[in-house]
Each structure stands twice: as structure tokens, then as C-alpha cells.
């Protein structure tokens, strides 16, 4: 059995009258990427802060890298790299200086930090920007620098809160490629995200959250098979209620979201036959995704 990097058992957290994390339990094995997937307000960032000992749970137990959070979280933090949701780089320092200053927080000698900086710059693809001030960098470059900074102490575990929020598609894909590089070298990653594609591409397993409660847990493929398991046809245009009556006999399930119909079927051609000749309709046929799982679990309006 894989060594456990993170273990949560029955964790609860409230702020005032608001229950933010509701009896959450999960484990993360060493060397895997585990995702916390949920909308804003699902409790993802609070969970990340509790893992780091920055927020104290009201109930339950958290163990990180074999150390109980709270009593010995400072010891575990020495082997953890953190990528916060919003970059907190020193804008007046250069790229190189940001890495140098951050390394000192871990008690590293200046000589040691200078030894590792070139490899971190290469990893982040910032070699040509080493002496540029942070304020001169693009959003994607800043994010890669924040990731490189989190690796200054060669951590066993990376805790990443919404790592690609605000990035354009090219910058996002570059971050994903760098994270896959780290996973291939045995790092453990726990990340919070609301990007379905990010979770599907990176995560070995994930936990779907809503209002601090776990709705499902498993690999992306297993969750898709369990909760969807067939082709999806999105239908735009027309009267949704009229279309539901027409196609219901030919689908396993049909859901309505606004003016869009989501049909789940093993026989897409039958659906197309029934809708043939109807003006004003647009159809999109695609394989199921985590977004379908997420929307089903968290409450898209469902046609009974």
C-alpha cells in the first residue's frame, strides 16, 4: 500500500453560523495528484488552509506527511511547498531575488539557494527573465515563478490553491505541463480547482465538494463512468419541454439547464432521427466529461 501523505478524518469548520467544511474525510497517497473540485464557496480554500495549519478545524483530525496538524504542523511545513490562489511575489524584486529571499525563510544558506536557482529558473522557463523585476512579467510568468518559489526547499508535497485561475489557455497549459513533470518525479500534489478540464487532465483522484460536503470521490474516469456512462447530446433552441417529450423514449436521462437540453444516450443516432427536420435546433454530440458529473451532482435542474 502507498504511504499516505494526507489524511483527513471527520473534519468540520464553521465561521460564525456558516458551516464551511462538513465532516470531510479523505486520504492522499504519496506521489499522486488529488483534486478538490467545487464552485466558489465549496470550502476548498479553507481545506487548504487547514492542511497548512493556518486555520484550526472545529472537529476531526488532519495528518500531513505523518505529522498531526496543529501539534506538529510546523515540522510538516518544512517539507511542503505552497502555491496560493493569488500571487504574493515582491513586485520590486527581480525574479532571482524573489527566489533568494524565499529560500531564507526555510533556513537555507545563500550559497545553497544560489546553487538551486538555475534549475528552478529552467523549470519555470524563466532563464531569460532572471534579472527582470516581477512587475515586468506576464501573468503566466508570475504564476510559474510562484510555482518555482514553492519548490525552493525541494518539498515532498505541493499544496496548490486554484493554480491557473486568471491565466489564458496557453499559460494554463504550460502550468499543467510543469505539474505533470513534477508528478513524474514523485511529488505529491493536492490542488483546489473549479476548472473541470484541469481536474480531468491532472488528477489521479478527486473529491467533488459542495457547501463543504463531499458528494463523490474517485478517479475522473471512474466518476464519469459511474455517474454518466454514455454519450452526451446538447440541444440548443426550440421549446425544451416539448423536446423532452419527444426524445425521452430514446435516452437514459434528460436534463434541462436554462434553454439547453442535455441528453444522455447510448444511441445518439436515434435522437438525431427524432429531431431531424426541426428548424432552429443546434446539436452538439460529445463524450461525457467531469463537467457532466459535477453539474449532475451539484444540482442542474433535472427533468423527472
From Swiss-Prot:
The complex is composed of two ATP-binding proteins (NodI) and two transmembrane proteins (NodJ). NCBIfam families: nodI, PRK13536.1, PRK13537.1. Part of the ABC transporter complex NodIJ involved in the export of the nodulation factors (Nod factors), the bacterial signal molecules that induce symbiosis and subsequent nodulation induction. Nod factors are LCO (lipo-chitin oligosaccharide), a modified beta-1,4-linked N-acetylglucosamine oligosaccharide. This subunit is responsible for energy coupling to the transport system. Belongs to the ABC transporter superfamily. Lipooligosaccharide exporter (TC 3.A.1.102) family. Pfam families: ABC_tran. It comes from Rhizobium sp. (strain N33). ATP binds at residues 38-45. GO terms for cellular component: plasma membrane. InterPro entries: AAA+_ATPase, ABC_transporter-like_ATP-bd, ABC_transporter-like_CS, ABC_transporter_ATP-binding, ABC_transptNodI, P-loop_NTPase. It comes from the Bacteria. Its EC number is 7.6.2.-. One of its GO terms (molecular function) is ATP hydrolysis activity. The keyword Transcription regulation does not apply. Residues 6-236 form the ABC transporter domain. It is found in: Cell inner membrane. Its main location: membrane. Keywords: ATP-binding, Cell inner membrane, Cell membrane, Membrane, Nodulation, Nucleotide-binding, Translocase, Transport. It is a peripheral membrane protein. This is Nod factor export ATP-binding protein I.
Amino acid at each position: 500500500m502507498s504511504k499516505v501523505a494526507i489524511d483527513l478524518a471527520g473534519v468540520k469548520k464553521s465561521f460564525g453560523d456558516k458551516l464551511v467544511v462538513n465532516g470531510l474525510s479523505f486520504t492522499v497517497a504519496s506521489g499522486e495528484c488529488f483534486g478538490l473540485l467545487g464552485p466558489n464557496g465549496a470550502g476548498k480554500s479553507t481545506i487548504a488552509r487547514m492542511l497548512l495549519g493556518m486555520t484550526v478545524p472545529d472537529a476531526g483530525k488532519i495528518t500531513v506527511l505523518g505529522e498531526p496538524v496543529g501539534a506538529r504542523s510546523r515540522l510538516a511545513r518544512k517539507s511542503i511547498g505552497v502555491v496560493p490562489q493569488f500571487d504574493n511575489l515582491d513586485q520590486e524584486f527581480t525574479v532571482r531575488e524573489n527566489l533568494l529571499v524565499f529560500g531564507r525563510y526555510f533556513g537555507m544558506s545563500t550559497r545553497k539557494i544560489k546553487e538551486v536557482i538555475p534549475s528552478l529558473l529552467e523549470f519555470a522557463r524563466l532563464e531569460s527573465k532572471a534579472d527582470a523585476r516581477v512587475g515586468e512579467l506576464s501573468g503566466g510568468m508570475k504564476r510559474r515563478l510562484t510555482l518555482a518559489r514553492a519548490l525552493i526547499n525541494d518539498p515532498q508535497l505541493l499544496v496548490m490553491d486554484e493554480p491557473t485561475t486568471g491565466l489564458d489557455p496557453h499559460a494554463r497549459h504550460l502550468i499543467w505541463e510543469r505539474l505533470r513533470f513534477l508528478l513524474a518525479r514523485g511529488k505529491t500534489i493536492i490542488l483546489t480547482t473549479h476548472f473541470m478540464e484541469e481536474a480531468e487532465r491532472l488528477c489521479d483522484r478527486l473529491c467533488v465538494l459542495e457547501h463543504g460536503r463531499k458528494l463523490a470521490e474517485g478517479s475522473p474516469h471512474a466518476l464519469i463512468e459511474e455517474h454518466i456512462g454514455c454519450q452526451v447530446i446538447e440541444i440548443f433552441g426550440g421549446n425544451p419541454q416539448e423536446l423532452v417529450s419527444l426524445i425521452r423514449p430514446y435516452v437514459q436521462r434528460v436534463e434541462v439547464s436554462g434553454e439547453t437540453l442535455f441528453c444522455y444516450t447510448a444511441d445518439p443516432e436515434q435522437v438525431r432521427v427524432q429531431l431531424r427536420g426541426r428548424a432552429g435546433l443546434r446539436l452538439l454530440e460529445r463524450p461525457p466529461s467531469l463537467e457532466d458529473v459535477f453539474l449532475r451532482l451539484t444540482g442542474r435542474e433535472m427533468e423527472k
